[in-house]
Amino acid sequence: MPADAARLATAFATTPPLVVLTSNRTREVHDAHKRRCLYHWLQHPDFDREVAILRRRLPDVTEQLAREVARATAKLRTLDLLKPPGVAEAMDWATALHTLGARELDPDVAARTLGAVLKYREDTDRVHAMARGALFGGG
C-alpha cells in the first residue's frame, strides 16, 4: 500500500448513491447490466432549444451562425447516416466555423468543415454527393 493511501480515510455514503449511465450505443451493454438499469430515451432538442444551447455554451458565436448550424444539423439528422450528429457535434461545428471567422453557414464553408460534425467518411461522402445548397442554404 502506498504511504499516501494509508493516510486517506474511508468514506461511507449515508444514502445509496444514484448512478446515471449514458450511452450513445456505440458498444453493446451486457444483458446482466441492462436488467439492472432503468431506461430513459432522450430526443434531440428542438430548433429553438438547440440554438439556446449553442448560444449559452458558445457566447462568441453569433445568433445567426448558431441558428444556421442548428438548422443544418437538424437537416443532417434526417439523413441515413452512420452517426447522426448530436448537440456536441453541433457545438464542435459552430466552434470550428467561428474559429475560421465564418459569419454565416454558406454551402462552401459548410462543405469544408463537415469533419467537425460528421465523424465517418461514408457520411461525409454521402453529404458531399448531395445537393449542398439543399442542405446548407438559407431556410
What are these regions (language model features)?
Residues 1-139:
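C-terminal regulatory/interaction module of P-loop NTP-utilizing enzymes
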